[in-house]
Amino acid sequence: CALPISEYNKSVREFDLVTLDRVRRIDIEPKLSVWQDYARAHRLHPAVTAYLELRPQHFYKIENDVDGVQFVTARGWEDLSAYLQAADRLALPVDEGVIGQYLRHPEVARDFAAYWVLYRKYHEDYGVEDILQGKPYDAVIARAMDASFDERISLVSLLLAGLNTRFADARATGAVTDACYQQLRSFKRTLSQQPDADPADLFAERCDAYRAKLEADKTAGALLPDEAAARTRTLALLTAWSRSLDNGLDADEAFDTVRGAFNTQVQRREEAVSAASNALEFAFDFMEQAFEDGQEMVVFVNELALGPDSAPFLAENDCERFEQYSEKLLLHGGEDELLAELQRDDVRAEEHSAEF
């Protein structure tokens, strides 16, 4: 049996003893580390996740005072993240008043509003994009080394956000390229099976079939957002290639035309992967100079290992320094954490052994 806490839901009622004797009780408490996994997988705004790393006590709060209930919950953070992402795209205002519409706790809303201003300022002051492009950054190294812990962690979050944009672009471009490759293979097979048909018509039919399947899957809700975006981009490319085919081309000429366009897409994928890999190397250069083996590097490597965009990219593209730091900072840390948890379990067992 699981019920929401009474502070959050007034419809909660206490069970009588007879009922309690017949149900299993599980106490559930909000846990930031679990929610951070969710936030990472759903790509919540990095300012939100970075702030909560620094202010975990603000993740979930419900308080009563003379003005009524003041609260902030996981749902509020997620909704705020969605607004911040829209604000980044559309240049919408972000101030304490807007933030307070999502974080219904004035103290937390005020604190996050102040952090948001600093977060944006750090992005400009440190020239995060310049760092990721390999431009000189000697002027900000000293500041990073002398910065407060909050500022250093915020800078790491900004670097990761810039990298994740590149990782996501490389993944999306790769997915589109792979989908186009499958269509070209099928097109080549169809050309050999129907030698008398017009190649341009055959490719147009293939585009129509791809479009119909995409629309059907969208209507059925069978596609995740990333899949829908990749297939939509694939359809746009296939349609453009179809328009470049003139009626009257023979099979070899038609296939060579489409293959030439596909090779351009392959080059785009290689450029996207190269841009992401180079940015990662530049980020490691900066991290090593600014933070060496500090806690900031642990956070940086851990987020790379767990990110929904970074982890697949690193699985497909080697990065020697990531492997080195993963082994040095993460693996041993995981063993230590496991041993510590086992020790805590032993202590709990000893504390409660008298009850039995």
Please tell me what each predicted stretch does.
Residues 35-37:
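Conserved beta-strand-loop-alpha-helix hinge in the C-terminal portion
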Residues 141-356:
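Terminal-proximal interaction/regulatory segments of ATP-powered molecular machines
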Residues 12-33:
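A short helix-turn-beta junction within AAA+ P-loop NTPase domains corresponding to the substrate/partner-engaging
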